[in-house]
Amino acid sequence: MATQASVEWIFNIAGSAASASIAKAIKDAGGSEDFAKYVIARFYDNYKDSVDDTGVYNACIGRARTVDKALDDSRKAERNEDWHTNLETISRLDLELAELKLILSNLGIKREDRVLNSMFSVVREEGKSSNTVMLKQNAVRMIEEGKLKIRVERNENYTASLKNKIEELECMIDAFEKGKEIIISLDAMNGEVKRDGNSCSYNSTAAFVSTIVGNPIKMYDESGKPLFDVGDYLNPKHIIDKMIENEIPIFKSDYRNNESPDFDVWNERSNLKIVSINDCHAICVFKFENAWWCFDDGVLNKYSGNGNPLIVANAKFQIDKILISGDVELNPGPDPLIRLNDCKTKYGIDIICRFYIVLDNDGSIIHMCYMRTGSAEAVAKGRSKKEAKRIAAKDILDQIGL
């Protein structure tokens, strides 16, 4: 402990010597004794904060402990000697780094600022007021090593759309930390729709943005005027820009338009798009259950494949539900699926199960389930895959007498 005590003594003596020198300089300059005491008190506070904030004090104490351990055990002494020999060439740099940290701390640049600056950079687009925060390589390395955790601050006053975007961001961060591919599941939905034959740009943009932000977007005020009015420039690209100006939480990383240099690459992988039909009509199309569907002025239809994409969403977005399909089941009652699975396990029966999708008369989705085991087979319809499968399972159980 002798070396450690000596280091602590050196820090104390250094502080005392510096304070005495400051007091003498103040008096020599004609300053009062009270003023000198005030400055010295402030100096001591700053001195302690600086040596603690920079890590210099802890680093010196740590080395002193190493020396004390080496003095207690000769084997540790040899190892310690090798360590200092191998690092002799960088010892001067280590000292200079400590001095720079002290200078930065005294300039008001604290540890939090240094850490943030070492891991993140801020990029500002020319002509834009918004900023983009970029991860530096140091931050990426720390995430890979599990040493850096990123969390998003929550606030109950946030809108539903913003809360959905925060949850999406947390999913992306979690996937990034675990080295997984980023996938965001979305519900396809319409925003506010006006069926007047002239509002297809607003309708398609409303569906596109509502689906991404996870909340139906209100498009018109009480008088029927568009909230995101773009005048004569009626194009989904301009409407999205207007939405961003009005702080709708959709970001440049969420989509690309056909003027972007990487548009073709995004278009190949995207599952959600705004498509122009004959340069006079716009619809929102999306991929669901390996088939393409569209919202055409709010009406759900199978997509024919005609048209040219104007705007495409990031490939991380995947549609796993259509909001108007009635996919949420309430009080389904006893579950034949569990009974059928028990029979499969108990008797070793093989079950074939396939699903199909058709449109009902009102434009909503109907799921069809074909199920067969042995000579028993059933076809059932439902508002969801699970509902259709449950009905088919009940039919199969009745046929095989269970």
From Swiss-Prot:
Principal place of residence: host cell
Similarity-based family: Belongs to the rotavirus NSP3 family.
Keyword entries, A-Z: Host cytoplasm, RNA-binding, Translation regulation
Domain DRBM: 334-402
Pfam families to which the protein is assigned, alphabetical: Rota_NSP3
Record function comment: May play a role in stimulating the translation of viral mRNAs.
Protein name: Non-structural protein 3
Residues annotated as site: Cleavage: G333, P334
Record has Hydrolase as a keyword: no
Localization per Swiss-Prot or TrEMBL: Host cytoplasm
Superkingdom: Viruses
Gene3D superfamilies, sorted: 3.30.70.1610, Rotavirus non-structural protein NSP3, N-terminal domain (6.10.280.20)
Any one Gene Ontology molecular-function term assigned to this protein's record: RNA binding
GO biological process: regulation of translation
InterPro entries reported for this sequence: dsRBD_dom, NSP3_N_rotavirus, NSP3_sf, Rotavirus_NSP3
Lineage, opening ranks: Viruses, Riboviria, Orthornavirae, Duplornaviricota, Resentoviricetes
Gene Ontology CC, one term: host cell cytoplasm
